[in-house]
Regions:
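Bacterial N-terminal signal peptides
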Residues: 9-20
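Structured mid-domain segments that build the active-site/substrate or prosthetic-cofactor binding neighborhood
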Residues: 290-294, 302-383
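Active-site-adjacent, His/Asp/Glu-enriched structural segments that form or flank metal-binding
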Residues: 55, 63-177, 191, 196, ...
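Mature N-terminal segment immediately following signal peptide/propeptide cleavage
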Residues: 27-60
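Scaffold signal of the M16-like zinc-metallopeptidase fold and its non-catalytic homologs
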Residues: 87-89, 114, 118-119, 135, ...
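Bacterial N-terminal signal peptides that target proteins for export
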Residues: 1-11
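An aromatic/glycine/proline-enriched structural segment found at the starts
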Residues: 226-282, 390-400
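His/Glu-based metal-binding/catalytic segments typifying zinc-dependent metallopeptidases
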Residues: 256-320, 352, 409-426, 430
């Protein structure tokens, strides 16, 4: 049984299930309550009224840039810049943003936070009380400053180096080192630069202010940014505020295009023995790469059906291995299959198999190959398929609103962010569109989630 053979199997199972669900090449229904627009400077905005919770709103600014945009002498500065956004801006010097918001009951680390990944940087203020109009204007001014007015004063930069060093230390573990070895294999042959977000300790300790400002001025610009505001307010009035407040932000002259990176497919089967002498665990991981739909296809019903089907396959295969590991003679204590999107051009299907006791790595390989061969020859049983489908639907029930009135701000925000960064559909439960994403389940032959 070859890995190539199993890659073909996974694709074949997906095609079989996909074909059995009335294939359609139509866009997903769009939530008509979302106001999406683009300012003259290229900044995108998403606005939606939602009264759950009543009297509150979420405010986000999404930057379609991350560690991948760093030059070699800026390794780690995308993440460092995220920290500096809370250490002084034009209208909120030093810790002004945190002090101002916490005085109004909006807590740092809980309601106020941010994250940096390899491809994006997102700042947000959640569950902000809409006490008065002037306060809302001040919160929008925070987003405005995060767009183009982060100060990066020298003293604040120097003070923050120690904070970043400690974060670097806590992220340096056997697991993280093996993960980096793993990524080197997965990204081999691709155009992605080698970045790990936390960056190089040498850069963190020694970069000059001009270097972080170079990154900031080059990449923090409105044509790579989106404002997302969802909550209990008048949506048209909020749109007017955003147009008034954010239209003055300018792009730099001669904007450098953001490069689109692609993963390279595996050209042959390979085995890598990844060892860290400090690691106290053993695992067999098998990765398969498969084509991921282009951005233009990610708001289609067919795309969401494919995600649903991949979840079913993963759940069925994982459940089968769960039954096998109950035997005391099984060399594995746990076996799991997941299918992840790289958000670029390829899926990763991943099998993780953990040993029982002192079982040898070769016995785990045999366990994987036996399962792969059985799937290739016989596929899934009807009971396995139906049980996995039920599990996936129950999970969707758990993580999706069961009525238009129960959808929360964060659920809507997540869809807007995904639309901006990855081209996902703007589909949510609303009075005008009660089916939303659940049209996928109906098309796949399963009742919709609503009672």
């Amino acid at each position: 049984m070859t890995i190539k053979g199993f890659r073909i199997l996974v694709s074949a199972v997906a095609v079989y299930l996909f074909a059995s669900a009335s294939a359609v090449a139509q866009p997903m229904p769009v939530d008509s309550l979302i106001i999406k627009g683009t300012l003259d400077n290229g900044m995108t905005y998403y606005i939606r009224h939602n009264a759950n919770p009543k009297g509150y709103a979420d405010f986000y600014i999404v930057h379609n840039v991350g560690a991948f945009q760093e030059a070699p002498n800026q390794d780690g500065l995308a993440h460092f810049l995220e920290h500096m956004a809370f250490n002084g801006t034009k209208h909120y010097p030093k810790k002004g943003i945190i002090d101002f918001l916490q005085a109004q009951g909006v807590r740092f680390g809980y309601n106020i936070n941010a994250y940096t990944s390899k491809s994006e940087t997102v700042y947000h203020m959640d569950n902000v009380p809409l006490k008065r109009e002037s306060f809302v204007d001040s919160v929008l001014m925070v987003l405005h400053d995060w767009s183009g007015d982060i100060s990066c004063e020298q003293k604040e930069l120097d003070d923050e180096r120690g904070v970043i060093r400690e974060e670097w230390r806590t992220r340096t573990s056997p697991q993280s080192r093996i993960f980096e070895l793993q990524e080197a294999v997965l990204y081999e042959g691709s155009t992605f630069p080698k970045r790990n977000v936390i960056g190089s300790l040498d850069v963190i300790n020694n970069f000059k202010r001009e270097e972080i400002l170079d990154f900031y001025d080059k990449w923090y610009r409105p044509n790579l940014q989106a404002i997302v505001v969802v909550g209990d307010f008048d949506a048209k009035e909020m749109e007017s505020k955003i147009k008034s407040m954010f239209s003055d932000i300018k792009n730099p002259e001669n904007c450098v295009p953001k490069e689109t990176y692609k993963l390279a497919p595996f050209v042959h089967e390979r085995f890598e023995n990844m060892v860290d002498t400090s690691a106290k665990f053993l695992a067999l991981k098998v990765f398969l790469k498969q084509p991921y739909p282009e951005v233009s296809q990610r708001a289609q019903r067919s795309f969401y059906k494919e995600q649903f089907i991949r979840q079913i396959i993963s759940a069925a295969v994982s459940a089968r291995m769960d039954e096998q590991v109950k035997s005391p003679d099984c060399p594995s204590s746990r076996g799991v299959m997941v299918s992840n999107a790289s958000r670029t051009n390829l899926y990763f299907s991943l099998f993780t198999i953990l040993p029982r006791g002192d079982a040898s790595p070769l016995s785990l390989v045999d366990f994987y190959c036996d399962n792969a061969n059985r799937l290739l020859r016989f596929g899934l049983t009807e009971d396995e398929f139906q049980s996995a489908k039920l599990k996936v639907v129950k999970n969707l029930r758990l993580h999706n609103a069961l009525s238009p009135e129960s959808v929360t701000d964060d659920q809507i925000v997540a869809g807007c962010v995904d639309n901006f960064l990855h081209g996902g559909a703007l589909t949510y439960p609303s009075p005008e569109n009660q089916d939303g994403n659940h049209v996928v389940l109906e098309a796949a032959g399963y009742p919709r989630l609503y009672p």
